[in-house]
C-alpha cells in the first residue's frame, strides 16, 4: 500500500476472494517463507535494550531473535508507515528532555535487512505515551498519552521524520474506579477506514471519543460524538472491521467487549452488543489487545490474568460476536499480538514471562492451535510485522 492509497469498504469486499487464496484457503501449500517483525519492549527493568527484530518461519511457526534493531528507552508500542519504509515508536516515559512528557521516535527501515536508523525523536506532549498509529495516507502520526490523558497528531516529513505536533487535545473527566480512573487516561487512537475521523479510547473517563480529521493537515476538531461506556468499564483498545461498518472496543477494567455500529459519514457510534472478553475465565482479568482476523470473519482478544487469546465469530450482518475458543498463551500477561502477513500464524507477546509464542490460524474456522514454538524476549509489549 502506498502513502497515497487508503483501504476502503469497496477494497475489502472486492478483494476478499483474492485474500482467501493468499491465506491458503484454496488448499495449496505455500512455499516456506521467512517474515520479520519488530518487537517493542519495556527497558526500565534493565533486561531489554529497545526494539528487537524477530524472524518467523511461516511454514513451521519457528522464530528467532536477530538482536537489537534500535536501542531506545521503553519503546512500548510501534506503528509502520504505509510505505513500509519507516517505523514509529512511542517512548513510554514520564520525563523527556527535562520536561514532564514522553516521546515519539521515527526510524528509517533498510529495505533488505530491516535495520533501523534513527530519524528523529520529539516530545509526545503528555506523560507515558502508550499508543501510536499512522493515518491511511501516511501523512500523520497519532499518539495517545496515558498518564496525561492527551492525544496528539504529528505531520510526517518527506523522509519519514516527524514534524512538530499539529494538534494536541486534553481529555477531561474521571470514572468510578478511584485507583485507575482518577483522571483521563488516553489508551488508543486510530483513524476510521475512510480517514475522515479520529477515534480515541480513554480508560480514565469511560469514553470513546470521535474527532473530525483533516487528512491534509492532521488537524482534529470535536464533533461532539463521545460515547460513554458502562461506568468503570475502562475502554483500552479499538479495532474496526475492514468493511468499516463496525467498531470493536475491549474494556480493561470490567473485562468486556463492546460492538458498535459505525456511521462513517457522521462519525456516530451505536452500541449493538456487550459480551465477556474472557467467557468463563479468571475473576481478575484485564483484557489488553484486540484485532479482526485476516479474513474479517473472526475477532481475537488477549486476556491478562486469564492469560488467553479469546476467539469470536463475527456475524457479517450485525457485527455481533459469538464466543468460539479460548487458548492459553503459554505465558504470563499477554499484551499485544499480531498476525503474520500470510495470515497463517498469530504471535503473542507475554510481557511478564519474557516470551513470544506462535499459533497456527485455521482460516476456515478461525481457531488457534499452538505451534509448539517459543522465543525469549525481555518484557515484550508490541509485535509489528513489516
Give each language-model segment a name.
Residues 64-69, 118-122, 175-179, 223-228, ...:
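A short beta-strand motif characteristic of beta-propeller blades
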Residues 24-42:
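C-terminal segment of N-terminal export signals and the immediately downstream linker at the start
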Residues 115-187:
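Asp-box/WD-like beta-propeller blade repeats and closely related beta-sheet repeat scaffolds
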Residues 43-46, 93-97, 148-149, 205-206, ...:
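Short glycine/acidic-enriched loop and turn motifs that connect beta-strands
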Residues 55-60, 108-114, 155-162, 212-219, ...:
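Short loop/turn segments immediately following beta-strands, especially the blade-tip
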Residues 2-20:
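N-terminal secretory signal peptides and thylakoid transit peptides that target proteins
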Residues 72-83, 125-136, 172-195, 229-246, ...:
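Beta-rich, blade/repeat-based domains predominating
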